[in-house]
Amino acid sequence: MSQVILDLQIACADSQGLPTEGDFQRWLEAVLPLFQPVSEVTIRLVDEAESHDLNLTYRGKDKSTNVLSFPFEAPPEIELPLLGDLIICRQVVEKEAIEQEKALLAHWAHMVVHGSLHLLGYDHIDDDEAEEMELIETEIMHGLGYPDPYISEKDPD
């Protein structure tokens, strides 16, 4: 039986309108058991200032971002289910959902799925990796009942 342990930290000045802890749990449970039976993840919801500071410190990018992934790397002789931390910026997620004409809850789900795949070692640095990661994300999002996250909901195609 698979188990996903979530440590949800809300560090936003305004927590009104955020997805529920149950939402975050459901999204993680759609991803992590596909790869390992027991997983522990911290999700920290932050405002733009914290996202900006972390993005500058760890990625050298002078702006806030939607999701940052910090994988936990234990020494090889120690087996721990701790995957790492996801830092998700509320304002960036909300702004992107509007700009990309996506349902807000679907975009939140996509950020959790996307960030979780990064914790599992997936990346999108080159085209082949990006294509593989996007296919996995799209399949998981469909399983959750959401549309393809790489197509705008109002896209005429």
From Swiss-Prot:
Q: Name one GO cellular component term.
A: cytoplasm
Cofactor field:
Zn(2+)
Molecular function terms in GO for this entry? metalloendopeptidase activity; RNA endonuclease activity; zinc ion binding
| Note on cofactor | Binds 1 zinc ion.
Q: Where in the cell is it found?
A: Cytoplasm
Q: Which Gene3D superfamilies match?
A: Metalloproteases ('zincins'), catalytic domain (3.40.390.30)
- What are its GO biological-process terms? rRNA processing
* First-listed, main subcellular location of the protein, grouped into a coarse class: cytoplasm
Q: Binding positions for Zn(2+)?
A: 114, 118, 124
**Xref: InterPro entries:** MetalPrtase_cat_dom_sf_prd, YbeY, YbeY_CS
- Quote the EC number: 3.1.-.-
Going by the record, the broad EC class of this enzyme is hydrolase
Q: Which Pfam families match?
A: YbeY
User: What are the entry keywords?
Assistant: Cytoplasm, Endonuclease, Hydrolase, Metal-binding, Nuclease, Ribosome biogenesis, rRNA processing, Zinc
Q: Which domain of life is it from?
A: Bacteria
Q: Which NCBIfam families match?
A: rRNA maturation RNase YbeY (TIGR00043)
The text of the family note is: Belongs to the endoribonuclease YbeY family.
The task this protein performs is described as: Single strand-specific metallo-endoribonuclease involved in late-stage 70S ribosome quality control and in maturation of the 3' terminus of the 16S rRNA.
The name on file for this protein is Endoribonuclease YbeY
Species of the source:
Yersinia pseudotuberculosis serotype O:1b (strain IP 31758)
Q: What is the lineage of its organism?
A: Bacteria, Pseudomonadati, Pseudomonadota, Gammaproteobacteria, Enterobacterales
